[in-house]
Amino acid sequence: MHRSISLRRCSIAFALAAALLTWPAAGYAELGGILPPPPTTTTGTVLGNASAVQATILGMTTVLSGTGSIGSNDALDASVLTGGVPSTLTAETLSASAISYADEVDSAASLGNLSMTVAGTGITADFVMAQASQVAGAPGSGSSTLTNLSINGIPVAVTGAPNQAIPVPGGQVIINEQTISSTGTAVVNALHVVVTGVADVVVASATAGIS
């Protein structure tokens, strides 16, 4: 059993590293590891942060593996092997990173073995990741990865399209939630569960903006 858990964690780490290698500027960044030094000059306003989990339950907010906000020519990361929100969520290998360059900001967050129950709705996934990027002068972009997502034991067909919504009692689950601001800042939430008046849970969130 220990070997199975170790292999699963290695697979998650490999998938995350492979995804980061597709980014022009963040190819050398590894979530939960040492980030490369950014260039020495950045112009404009920088927005960047990431978190593995941000859960607000009955007005109480918990953040797991959150980077906080980056500044110009900055790099932040956060990771833990296991984490959870009491009576709501458990997960493994929670990681987040954000980095700013002279003309680009990249951020990403991920976790594995997600199991959560929000207002009676059970949600599981083997792997969840969000990534966002913006190059100065161009609109930001991002994507999400969700592996073996199930809601109340029923497998969910993840389309890959932004803002795929699934109704649940009292609210909805939004998959690959994406917003692009007027300045091009990209915000990507891989999984967003909202139950009105009870809970607002975001799993794997990444923000990247430079203007």
Region annotations inferred by a language model:
Residues R3-F14:
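Bacterial N-terminal signal peptides that target proteins for export
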Residues G27:
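Conserved binding-pocket/active-site segment within a compact domain
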Residues E30-S211:
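Extended, solvent-exposed, non-transmembrane regions
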